[in-house]
Amino acid sequence: RIKKPIFAFPRF
């Protein structure tokens, strides 16, 4: 799973 911060979209 790619690193997704809190402001990251669920597209990853």
UniProtKB/Swiss-Prot annotation:
Localization terms from the record: Secreted
Taxonomy, superkingdom: Eukaryota
Keyword Secreted: yes
GO CC terms: extracellular region; host cell postsynaptic membrane
PTM per Swiss-Prot/TrEMBL: Both amidated and non-amidated conorfamides As1 are found in the venom. Amidation is important since amidated peptide is more active.
Stated family: Belongs to the FARP (FMRFamide related peptide) family.
Function: Conorfamide As1a: this amidated form is active on both ASIC channels and nicotinic acetylcholine receptors (nAChRs). Shows a weak inhibition of peak current of rat ASIC1a and rat ASIC3. Inhibits desensitization of ASIC1a and to a lesser degree ASIC3 currents, resulting in a sustained opening of channels in the presence of low pH. Inhibits with a slow reversibility human alpha-7/CHRNA7 nAChRs (IC(50)=737-4984 nM) and with rapid reversibility human alpha-1-beta-1-delta-epsilon (CHRNA1-CHRNB1-CHRND-CHRNE) nAChRs (IC(50)=215 nM). Conorfamide As1b: this non-amidated form is only weakly active on both ASIC channels and nicotinic acetylcholine receptors (nAChRs). Shows a weak inhibition of peak current of rat ASIC1a. Shows a very weak inhibition of peak current of rat ASIC3. No inhibition of desensitization on both rat ASIC1a and ASIC3 are observed. Reversibly inhibits both human alpha-7/CHRNA7 nAChRs (IC(50)=2029-8464 nM) and human alpha-1-beta-1-delta-epsilon (CHRNA1-CHRNB1-CHRND-CHRNE) nAChRs (IC(50)=820 nM).
Protein name, per record: Conorfamide-As1
Protein's organism: Conus cancellatus
